Amino acid sequence: MAEEDHISAPDLIPASMLSDYSYCPRQCYIRWNEGEFAECEDASANASDADGSAASSPLACKTIHLSAPKLGVTSRINLIEGDGGARDVMPALLKRGEPAASIAGGVYDPDRVRLCAQALVLQENGFLSSCGLIYFSKSRKAVSVQFDEPLIQMTREMISQVRAMAEQRRMPPPLVDSHKCNHCTFGGICLPDEVNLLRQLKDGNSILAGIEDPVQGESRELRMLLPSRDDQVPVYVLDQGSTVHKKGDCLEVRSRDGKAGTVRMIDISQLCLYGGVEISTPALVELMQRSIPVLHFTHGGWFEGICLGHTSKNIDLRIRQFDWARDRNRSLSLARGMISGKIRNCRVLLRRNDHQIPGEVLERLAEYAGQAGGAESFEGLLGIEGVAAQLYFSRLGSLLKTDDLELSFKGRNRRPPRDPVNAVLSYLYGILAKECFVTLLAVGFEPYLGFYHQPRYGRPALALDLMEEFRPLVADSVVVSLFNNRELEVKDFVITDEGVMIGSSAKRKVVAGYERRMDTKITHPLFGYKISYRRVLEVQSRLLARVISGEIERYPAFCTR
């Protein structure tokens, strides 16, 4: 990227960064260059505490923080005094596991390198240090590490490699079929198997391009390196006049009539406030400190904004995003995949649920999807999307199993919606836009700068880009389900000459239906494993980041079969 020269490596590299690099250069880059943090079981569950502390060990240690400008390393070091006086010391690490039985000495290279780097820091500051100590709490054994010349040379070379990686701002390639990935909690961020598969394909969209072709549509069975769904869930506050307060480690939501409910903050992924709902400052600050976003909507469901503590530290991704957005050709290449995927998913929804659909409609949608994938301009792509949308919405009403004319659907309308179906569609599109906004922000993107939707004041263009392929799969599917299952009826809506509004109780039903859909596990059409739709959004966002960074050639839209 053109701005790379303006981003310099840190003057001092943490010694723990060297152990991360020794274990997996890609994990090191994700953690230190992109600012993503997740405790890695394989690298650190059998390793030292996150800060290298040995406070809970029986060793007589004192902890100091030293830097070595000449070496270019800084570290928090646990010191054990040797027999040679106060300047004769040993660096020490506390491990939660036990010595490795499969290797000589019982200590893996990442920890040997970290200890050696600490010793070099000590030596530059006038200490004597020829060996280190690792205490394994599970087995209560202490293992000595000698700082011989080969280890010192390996450590110095690794310092140079880490500095070069930080200066180049290029993510190292993922490991291939490595056992290290199996228990690494960076798996959902790194996506090693997914990236390796896509890099093997000449065309990142080719496997997803086949609508009926069983060969092209065949998925690969990849390792499940990411959780299938989140343990944390969104919390929605819809009742007007409600207040949200902090109560210990919980949030208390109190309605206007005095009824109160609590939810543990550890279980919350995001807090969504609709209309006239107030939140106290202590509650807001606590959520900010926990990096839990607070999202504000109008009473009608229009997404207004977000309150969040610190956003992603991945400035490299945002710089590359702005570079891509300025390049119309590269932006168009992304937009083609997104819109083509959207049209294919529209076709799938109709094919599955409209049993009387003319074959001509499916053929035309397939043609439009192909044309979108090869569009030569934004104007042409907009035209193709518009024609496909008109055809799709002309058949969407056929999916509704109701004889009530007031619940019929004859086409898309909005601002204000003039029938209940369109009212629910608009409401769900607002929730889905919020979901994409939060996901993109967490990955490190700027949600207001898109590639297909052009920048406009207050419009989350990239969130709208990402949600295109999920409109039929999530929002439209939920609408059909809610009306066909009689969860929503005419009495749930306020129908006037000016438009249609959703009643308060109906909004709860809509949100519940949306959350059921987002929590549904689906087999990924390309990678073969089962994950929830909410997790799919994150995977797609991270794949988009891999395209922006140059790791994979094309964006693989999520298309079901």
Name what the model sees in each region.
Residues 13, 160-182:
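Immediate flanking context of iron-sulfur cluster ligation sites
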Residues 57-161:
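Mg2+/Mn2+-dependent nuclease catalytic core
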Residues 1-68:
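Charged, glycine-rich intrinsically disordered N-terminal tails and low-complexity linkers that flank
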Residues 23-26, 179-192:
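Local cysteine-cluster metal-coordination motifs and their immediate loop/turn environment
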Residues 46, 63-67, 209-247, 254-256, ...:
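Active-site helix-to-loop segments that bind/position phosphate- or nucleotide-bearing substrates
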Residues 107-133, 290-294, 430-438, 472-477:
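Metal-dependent nuclease catalytic cores in nucleic-acid-processing enzymes
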Residues 38-42, 197-211:
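Short cysteine/histidine-rich metal-coordination sites, predominantly Zn2+-binding motifs
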Residues 80, 267, 273-348:
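A surface-exposed, charged beta-strand/loop segment in the N-terminal or early-internal portion
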